[in-house]
Amino acid sequence: MNPGPADPFRLPRTVSPERYEIRLEPDLERLTFTGQEMVTVIVRERVTEVVLNAAELQIQQVSIRSATGATLKGEATLEEAGERARLIFPEPLAPGTWRLSLAFTGILNDRLHGFYRSTYKTPEGEKILAATQFEATDARRAFPCWDEPAFKAVFQVTLVAPERLQVVSNTPVASEQAIVGTGRKAVTFAPTIKMSTYLLAFVVGELEASEPIMVGLTPLRIWSIPGKTHLTAFAREIAASSLAFFEQYYGLPYPGEKLDLLAIPDFAAGAMENLGAITFRETALLVDAGAASHAELERVADVVAHEIAHMWFGDLVTMAWWNGIWLNEAFATFME
């Protein structure tokens, strides 16, 4: 499906992203976040504006730099109804490679989509973690982006968080650095494969991980809030056998570098197939195999297998537009 110039629901194809470098700092007390990003873009024809998706964000700084080093400052105009931002520049952008820089702020919402807050109760009181749910069109609530599945790009994420918290994203940690005098750390993750925005994920909070097991060359772990690690063994066993089976069945190696399965206390769907960081509702991942019913075990096994099937069919190979989602889900259901 190739959108025409008057299509009100699709982004223009004049500019497309190649690589995002995103730095986000969530504040779990104020329930806000700040962000900066640098996006390598390809300009395909002369334009004076760049149109991308943004929702519930405030864009404070805009600039773009050419391959020769020339920099233009721009202004952002937000279109709330269309969930778009128009970045307007004083001179036309020539065709070629440019680097777009943006600074922005947002809110950790309580609506279980975008970059949101998840709450849970402990003997010490209520706790909060920050999690993401981007399918179908909610990555734009975490950072300005080309939030359509056909606009695949590489993502490199840096999360800034208190040193006592755990941070997880799609790829392994590439570096971790303490920010002197702040009690915070900056964790940078390895670049992803080229993928759609809706498959990016990150979680920040008090988390515990199961002992990793190796499935071929892939480390696999289950993450949960503290005190629930004893409920991860069944899902880990199912995940390991599913991952090994699908690698053999598809005849293609798993496309990620690691596989984390994360149980989120507040989660709208059953699970979400973020590449390398699959998020789940707790009841779809955590189970006491010795006390659970057959139906409960079958439910966990089905959901885990379904999401791992998506790592190839949906993540590695993705529909160009949402009218193809039926095949994405139908094939994963068949492969359960």
Question: Where do the PLM segments sit?
Answer:
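N-terminal, polar/Ser/Thr-rich
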Residues: 1-34, 69, 124-129, 149
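Glycine/proline-rich low-complexity spacer/linker segments in large multi-domain proteins
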Residues: 5-12, 94, 103-156, 205-214
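Beta-strand elements of well-folded, non-transmembrane domains
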Residues: 26-28, 39-45, 106-108, 161-163
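Ligand-binding face of N-terminal immunoglobulin V-set domains in extracellular IgSF glycoproteins
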Residues: 33-56
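Hydrophobic helix-coil surface modules that form long, contiguous segments used
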Residues: 35, 132-137, 144-305, 334
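Short edge-strand/loop segments of extracellular domains
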Residues: 55-58, 117-129, 264-269
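A surface-exposed beta-strand-loop module
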Residues: 56-122, 147, 180-181, 188
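Catalytic Zn2+-binding segment of zinc metalloproteases
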Residues: 308-323
